[in-house]
Amino acid sequence: MKTKFRSILILRFSSIGDIVQTTSVVGTLKFYFPDAIIDFMTLSKFAPLLKDHKKINNIHSVNIKDGYLKLKKIGLNINKLDYDLVIDLHNSTRSKIILSSIRRIKKLRLPKPRWKRFNLFMFHLNFFSKNFSVKTRLQDPLK
């Protein structure tokens, strides 16, 4: 990433272990953009998990019961918050609805290896590379 970002929002709504793993991305972003404001959006029940993270400036929470219209409104409100970059580390229906309302902000999305994961769990066929790691995969959108 060669661009200078001043304000970055990371989206990851669940689950607890995945949210903890995404904090490695926060560290990477702070390394490359030490002066950037880095905010995090997650489900309200997971917000306390991140509240004392030294590299996260603000935590935005979403209620698990928020429907389509509420999520669209959240996306519209993000437009008003002056972010330079939104990184979707969940790639879920919820994050796609929110991102669909975001305009004039650069968006990066983590591709999910759904087919590989399905084959691994259902048929015990591992199509992941030998050096695959979740931590490395989380960094992919930053390349």
Model-derived regions, located:
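Catalytic machinery of carbohydrate-active enzymes
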Residues: 1-143
